[in-house]
Amino acid sequence: MKKQTFSILLLLLCAVAYGQRKHSKTSAFKSYKGLVMAGYQGWFNAPDDGAGRGWNHYLSHGRFEPGSTNIDVWPDVSEYKKTYKSPFKLADGSDAYLYSSYDASSVDTHFKWMQQYGVDGVFVQRFIGDVQRGHGRNHNDVVLGNALKSAQKYHRAISLMYDLSGMGAGGDSLVIKDWKHLIDSMKLTNRGDKQTWLYHRGKPLVAVWGIGFDDHRKYGLAEAERIIDFLKNDPVYGGCAVLVGVPTYWRDFGSDTEKDPHLLDVLKKADIIHPWFVGRFDEAKYSAFYERISFDIAWCKDNKLDYVPTVFPGFSWHNMNPRSPQNQIPRNRGHFYWKQITGAIKSGADMLYVAMFDEVDEGTAILKASKNPPVGLSHFVSYEDDIPNDYYLYLTGYAGKMLRKQVPFQEDVPPPVHK
């Protein structure tokens, strides 16, 4: 009888403890394993969208006009409900248009594409320096709220990725305050057991990107460790699984990684290790690079951690950084992207992170890109004539099927499906 009473009390205590946390017990997406998720910036604006941020992320040094822009890929906006006339012209002399991430219809279009092409979901990016007040916080909250609705509508997984870039010393308190704000105001992870927030290891997953980079950041491992501890252990807002975004050479303290050995102790507190590979190799150099993934995975297994590598379709940021060549890492009809996808799977990766869904700034976007970009003083990367504008959405969906063994593994890139 005493044993039975003790067991009942223990169950009640556990139930009370869980009830104090502000998360639903589960989700329609119970694990990152078997999924291909993309990063989602959602940071583009237009002067008339109501956000008060001008041509945010389209402009360069305060100007948006031919010869002055931050983007290298021009998005195809033919399927968007709302678009905005830009100062750029197409080859026939007509006006070129753009979309705003602030519009719910733009976010809805993106999630509809994810469903149509089989992209499993996204991590909505949240730069802590951009969400402290005013227009920045409002924009990011609106985009996240719209993404939550569209993720549910189209049954796509969704999570949040805090990007610590630009955070100052002691900025962990800002992350903690912001997480509480989102949990209380949006009920991010408390939308019922059929919600589409991504869970992992039985807990809602949150990502914290920018830990261990050796690029003169004002914050350090102490702030990162406090954020991880809070997200995992706080009695009310914690109880989360944590993905940490780290440098490429995190494991052996290479050129992009700070040399403090405590880094590995901090990373062991997380649940998933996610190294950033964008710009580290091109197609020719990937074969020599990708064995690193299998060594990373072995380390993670030894330390009871999961691992997700980055894959990206190409890279170009000439308009943002004119000294860099345009089309710096060519897509090569999808061969570069597919080489990384097959390399990661062969190395033992059981989940993938795509950089990025919508980042036209650095030419890594997988969304539909214009085959007829503006002409003039600014130059834009365009896909090859025989490659359709939706090819990278298609490849991303196919990668998910291959990762889950729903289709046979194939080294050769699947050919485009022309409509």
Features from the language model and the residues they span:
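Glycan-processing catalytic domains of CAZymes
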Residues: 21-419
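Bacterial Sec-dependent N-terminal signal peptides
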Residues: 1-22
